[in-house]
């Protein structure tokens, strides 16, 4: 019996896979629990159309991320913060401060996609990575200076 999986099933396949299973397993478990549907010609056609639309949508999201990456490519930030006499920052500089500085420059970036490798606790030059898409990321250099 051929079926189309509606969700990931362990040891069988992933969502939208067309797999062959024994009739009893498909009829008595997978289909009643909503994990699969029978792979009729019309269901296969609908699956192909859905996958085509999803691929088109994902391509558009990736192009948008690449456009934002192109805008961020030459950006360099300077973050002024309060510093002790030994050169240590009061607190630390993280993704929130970087997102605020980018917003001042006109780039609205969610702070959750900005990654700073280590805690920035001293004055100096550092790099942050903005992960716009799983395949698109931009490295932004920033410098922490005393106020």
UniProtKB/Swiss-Prot annotation:
Role, per record: Binds to the 23S rRNA.
GO BP terms: translation
GO cellular component terms given for this protein: ribonucleoprotein complex; ribosome
Gene this protein is translated from: rplI
Protein origin, superkingdom: Bacteria
SUPFAM superfamilies linked: L9 N-domain-like, Ribosomal protein L9 C-domain
Keywords: Ribonucleoprotein, Ribosomal protein, RNA-binding, rRNA-binding
Record-stated family: Belongs to the bacterial ribosomal protein bL9 family.
InterPro entries, alphabetized: Ribosomal_bL9 (IPR000244), Ribosomal_bL9/RNase_H1_N (IPR009027), Ribosomal_bL9_bac/chp (IPR020594), Ribosomal_bL9_C (IPR020069), Ribosomal_bL9_C_sf (IPR036791), Ribosomal_bL9_N (IPR020070), Ribosomal_bL9_N_sf (IPR036935)
UniProt-recorded name of the protein: Large ribosomal subunit protein bL9
